[in-house]
Design a protein with these regions (language model features):
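Bacterial N-terminal signal peptides
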Residues: 12-23
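Non-catalytic beta-sheet/beta-sandwich ligand-binding modules that flank or precede catalytic cores
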Residues: 26-285
Length: 285
């Protein structure tokens, strides 16, 4: 469960950070034809949640952790554990013990949900896919409200590292309201939020920093159609324990894709990230 990643001394604290309407309107697409979808389900910890996890989710100690990322920001008032169904390799169906959106609770980030429960064992009956079984609604912040019921996605196995699953441009003018973490410096011309399948840190358990900034490669497209690969001028939205980074760009050229090389960031299970690539969206939540 990569969202729970922390430095060794603060690991349990970050774990705890993860625990903490109207009649449904069914739709399959929003106003720009973006489908409602589960983007990822990441089997991050197998029977490994610490005892302190019981503080915000009684009975969580020793259970599994699985962050899932959705295509749109959701209405937290419609979020219930019964909305999710985890199906194991053998076909067994499991409902989470509890769910939480912590710590990815900034505006625009409300699309990552941590599932806590018993979802099978990595060695003999691992989780195979996650399905939305209830009426989990988007918040309608940038499109009409849609229902995720029926969406499903294959589970990334326990021994695989986290990948980028979403990238979107966000308005520089809204930057201060978009994050509780560190901010981009003054004067940036474009900001891209990237979302990982779960929280990531350096192999030494420290927060990502300038070295990781230089590893991010953003392809931008100029007005004449030419493209260039650049590194962000700064890396922001750090020190808040979630699975999002802000890439602060000092160019007005439009960001079209983001790459990050394999082997530099890890999840709580110690699995290194693979080489990962994601196209940049227009900021639709």
């Amino acid at each position: 469960m990569t969202i729970l990643y922390r430095a060794r001394r603060g690991w349990a604290a970050l774990t705890l950070a993860w625990l903490a309407i109207t009649s449904p309107v069914f739709a399959v697409a929003n106003e720009t034809d973006e489908p409602a979808a589960l983007l990822s389900a990441f089997f991050g910890l197998d029977n490994a949640l610490p005892f302190m996890a019981n503080v915000l989710c009684l009975g969580a100690s020793g259970l599994d952790g699985m962050p899932v990322v959705l295509s749109h920001t959701i209405d937290p008032e419609t979020l219930e554990a019964e909305d999710f169904e985890v199906v194991t390799q053998s076909g067994a169906k499991q409902t989470p013990h509890c769910v939480t959106m912590r710590p990815a609770q900034d505006p625009g980030e409300l699309r990552t949900v941590l599932l806590i429960g018993e979802f099978g064992n990595a060695d003999d009956d691992p989780p195979a896919f996650v399905r939305i079984a209830g009426d989990l609604m988007s918040d309608g912040s940038r499109s009409k409200r849609i229902n995720f019921r029926g969406s499903d996605v294959a589970v990334t196995p326990l021994d695989k590292g986290p990948s980028l699953v979403l990238a979107e441009r966000i308005a520089v003018s809204n930057l201060a309201a978009e994050t509780r973490g560190t901010l981009c410096p003054q004067g940036v011309q474009e900001v891209v939020r990237v979302t990982w399948a779960g929280g990531v840190r350096r192999p030494n358990r420290e927060e990502a920093g300038d070295a990781e900034r230089m590893l991010y490669r953003v392809t931008v497209e100029r007005a004449d159609g030419s493209t260039q690969e650049i590194a962000p001028a700064a890396l922001a939205d750090l020190d808040d324990g979630d699975n999002n980074h802000l890439l602060c760009l000092d160019t007005a050229a439009v960001a079209v894709s983001v790459d990050f090389p394999a082997g530099y960031l890890v999840d709580p299970n110690g699995d290194l990230n693979p080489d990962t690539h994601i196209m940049v969206g227009a900021g639709l939540n």
